[in-house]
């Protein structure tokens, strides 16, 4: 809301000019429609670039599970059409978006991948010291199925004396988080939905063996 108010102030102060570009790093953002509204009302030609992470168009995402599609689908289509460039990490996610929302003009949908190079520099250069730990790096949402991991973790602890860590349940700094990954032997995922997969990639770079669903 504060960002939208700041952008509205820039329009009001005549600081937004023809050719200006907006990059919105999560497309599910009301600012996009507001930017489009203000720009067209004031006859200012701007470009809007947006990154789609997830939405109600994905039946396994939290929005897909909770949102009423009678309004969420038209809203996602409106956001897509308001943007000049819509970015998706993979062909799979772009195609899901286009198919489930019945997008007729796919010329605005681009596969961008994600910039992971910084992880290689930051993580691969640090030595690891492994312990018998299985780590769960994901959000505690239904699409990540944390209860499945908790069940497995209890068996590992009781029968094999293997410790498990759910990072989202701990108040870790980034440095502590990476230290946990470097100490863990295995990184576990049972996610129904994965977009960036950054937690598994971080785990891999920290030397943890990834275990993921066979989908």
Feature-to-residue mapping (PLM):
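Active-site proximal beta-strand in glycosyltransferases
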Residues: 21-26, 40-62
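N-terminal pre-catalytic "stem/leader" segment of glycosyltransferase-like enzymes
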Residues: 1-39
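Aromatic "clamp/platform" in nucleotide-sugar-dependent glycosyltransferases that forms part
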Residues: 192
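Short alpha-helical segment that forms part of, or immediately flanks, the ligand-binding pocket
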Residues: 178, 201-205
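Membrane-proximal helix-turn-helix segments that form the acceptor-binding/catalytic region
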Residues: 65-86
